[in-house]
Structure formats: structure tokens, C-alpha cells
Amino acid sequence: MKKGIRYETSRKTSYIFQQPQHGPWQTRMRKISNHGSLRVAKVAYPLGLCVGVFIYVAYIKWHRATATQAFFSITRAAPGARWGQQAHSPLGTAADGHEVFYGIMFDAGSTGTRVHVFQFTRPPRETPTLTHETFKALKPGLSAYADDVEKSAQGIRELLDVAKQDIPFDFWKATPLVLKATAGLRLLPGEKAQKLLQKVKKVFKASPFLVGDDCVSIMNGTDEGVSAWITINFLTGSLKTPGGSSVGMLDLGGGSTQIAFLPRVEGTLQASPPGYLTALRMFNRTYKLYSYSYLGLGLMSARLAILGGVEGQPAKDGKELVSPCLSPSFKGEWEHAEVTYRVSGQKAAASLHELCAARVSEVLQNRVHRTEEVKHVDFYAFSYYYDLAAGVGLIDAEKGGSLVVGDFEIAAKYVCRTLETQPQSSPFSCMDLTYVSLLLQEFGFPRSKVLKLTRKIDNVETSWALGAIFHYIDSLNRQKSPAS
């Protein structure tokens, strides 16, 4: 394992599929007698050759027809896809007759790159079911290679090998391969981000998987929120019940934070600012979602803003960043987006939490839209919401759990008070908990609002990746009619 690369453990569940059957053409060898005249031999050999050629051509035609049929039943057509890459064999079928297909999603985040390999089964005339997921991740994120693009290819190839090992060979050429980059690349200068994406696309094009012109892109914040909403509602079963109740989602990443839910109140739709509503079509139904991503309000970017720094820029003249959210005696260094900052606390004229809350409120002022309907919608929260809650014992670190929004404030006050006299190994804990507490209240959540915090539902990670590949495959099916 090369230095600087750290892998997460993979997770697999078993699946069943039938190996593709051999073609219907069976040739039988029989011995041709050498007795007889030379004339008989001259006729027999050419005749046998012709029969063999006929059988071979017929087999090839049958093989291509079934492969093409399988390809279109999985993904109708991707714009710019390499059409020579149809599946070698018919679509896999589980023992119960359900169709089997795969999707690969690369999540290029601000702190690392992760590959998700999904296997789906689809009962006849029903919505698909996720039956298998494998993921692995490596650090750092793609943005770390902004000044040395060639180095980014090695990690991408290593993660592609994970997909090759997990997906049966006969499915490779019909399996969509997609990379979506999030806040890490959004914050890079446009030219640097595009060079990274072009390098990844080149690596993808050389892979054996199905690659379209849109296989590599920077995901806008709204789509990130929508994809996470799909994941949560797919895993909870809400998408399988037309008109059934749905749940909202809260995602707190390093560079951005998202909120998404399905409004049931007309007033929410009318009061939403431009860009906060998006139409989503899934399973032949259309959903009008409230979804928005706040770039710069992810936990790491918020830290920098609270410290008084500027994204992507070192402190002027190496100046130390001083914050009321740190222990008064703290001095140290903090690295963010490949920039190292010198940071320190300051003497407190009041309680640490009180001063920190005032500073966080300044950062959040007029940055977040508040909606009343969130009070009445069940919400799942994950990513840094989960990590922070688990870190201070509000939920079980492995199983997750439920809490009320006010628990974050209680934890923040306790940690901040402790830091005033006993500097801890987590110098940013007071700042982070205070930030999350006030962010949730800015969204409109009362302190008594219950949130469900989880990393997994039915042993599947609650990230946007599942929703994104699911939506991608669904859109491919709509772009190409069966008759084409």
C-alpha cells in the first residue's frame, strides 16, 4: 500500500445470478470415413466447412442480439456512450426471475474520493431493490491534485479495480460508471477543476464500463441534496408507496450543507426563494422538492469563516487567526483545503459559549432560509451531524439514534465550559457544536424537534451516492425508448 493512501473497510452482501447460458447452436463431431474415392472427400470437406461457417455466423448474430437486448433493458442509452460496449451476455437473472443490474458511483468529496458499487434486482413490473453495496475510499480528495493532475489517476484506477472485482465480468460493459465531485472541486478555480475532471474522464474511457459524455461532472448543490433525499426515501421505502409519507434529509459535509424535503403545504412552495424548488422525476412520478445547498457552510468551511479566514487563501503575512470559540490557552495549526493556518484562542471577557455563539451568529446572518414546515416533517441527519453527536455521546457511535435539536446546544455549553479551564484534544469541539446548534435553529427547527441520526439504513450507507446512481440509471431509461 502506498504511503498517504488510507482505505476504509469494504462491505459486501451476497447476491445470486445465473451465469449466461451457451448459445443454442450445438455442433457434434463425427468421424468421416476415409473409405471411398477422392471425389467424395473433395465434396465432404467443403460442405463441412460451409456448415461450420453457417453455424458460426448464426451464433454470432444470436449472441449480439441477446447482448443488445440486455444492454437496453439496463440502460436505454447514455448520451455519448461507447455503443460498441454492449454486454457479452443476457441480463443476469436471479433464481426468482428478478432482473439484476449494477451501477458505479464515484463520490469525489472535499476530503477524499470514494467508490460505491451497487447491485440492484428488479421484480417484474416493480421498482428495483438494492441487494448489494461495496464501497472503498482513499484520501486525499481530488482537489489536492489541482497542481499535479497526473497523480490523481493512480487513486482512480485503484478504486476502479474494486468495481472490477465486485461486478461479474459479463456485466462490465453494461454497467454505468459515473463520478460526481462536490464542494471540494466547486471551490477550486474553474480551469484547475476542469483539468482534473478531464483526467478522470480519460481514465474512465479506458475502463471496460459504460461511459457517457456526462460521466464526470461537478455536482451542483441542489442535485446533491436531491440525491441524498432519494437515498433516504428509497431505503425507508417511501418511494415505493405513491402518495405515502416521505422524510426530509439534512447533510453536513466539509464544504457545504444541504437540506431537502417534500413540501405538503402550499405556503412553503409560495414562500420559497428562487432556486429552492426542484422537480424530480422517479419511477414515472414527479416530486416537487424543497432542496438547497449552502456552499461555504459545511463544517470545515464554516470553521474557517468563524476563524476569520478566506477560503483558499493563506492568512495575510502568516498572521495568526484568533477566535473566541477556542480555549483561551490554545495555540496550534489547522490545515484546510491544502492551506495551513496558525490559530489561537483569546482571553474571554464572558463565557466561551456566549462569545462563540455571538461569532457564529455573525457568520450565519442572512445566509440561511428559514421555513416553518420543517417543524412538521420527519428528518434524517447524517455526515458531520452524526460524527459530532457521536463524539460527545449524544448517540451510539455505531448504531446512531435520535436526539432533539436542543441536545446540540446543551452539549456545546458543556464542552465550551470545560475548555475554559481544561484544554482538550479536540480544540474545535466548542466551535463545531455551537455552529451546528445555531445552524439547525436558523433552518427553522425548534429545540424540541426530534432528528434521526444514522450512517446506515438496512446496512446501506446514507449518502447521496445511491440516490445519484439510481437517478442516473432511471434517466438513461427515459432518454431512449425501447424501440430505438
Curated annotation (Swiss-Prot):
The chain crosses the membrane at residues 40-60. It catalyses: a ribonucleoside 5'-diphosphate + H2O = a ribonucleoside 5'-phosphate + phosphate + H(+); IDP + H2O = IMP + phosphate + H(+); GDP + H2O = GMP + phosphate + H(+); UDP + H2O = UMP + phosphate + H(+). One of its GO terms (molecular function) is IDP phosphatase activity. GO terms for biological process: response to calcium ion; response to magnesium ion. Its main location: Golgi. It comes from the Eukaryota. Expressed in most tissues, but predominantly in heart. Residues 61-484 are lumenal. It is an enzyme of class 3 (hydrolase). The secreted form may be produced by intracellular processing. N-glycosylated. Optimum pH is 7.0 to 7.4. Glycosylation does not appear to be required for enzymatic activity. Keywords: Calcium, Cell membrane, Disulfide bond, Glycoprotein, Golgi apparatus, Hydrolase, Magnesium, Membrane, Secreted, Signal-anchor, Transmembrane, Transmembrane helix. Belongs to the GDA1/CD39 NTPase family. Residues 1-39 are cytoplasmic. GO terms for cellular component: cell surface; extracellular region; extracellular space; Golgi apparatus; Golgi membrane; plasma membrane. This is Ectonucleoside triphosphate diphosphohydrolase 6. The active site is at residue 224. Strongly and equally activated by either Ca(2+) or Mg(2+). Its cofactor is Ca(2+); Mg(2+). It comes from Homo sapiens.
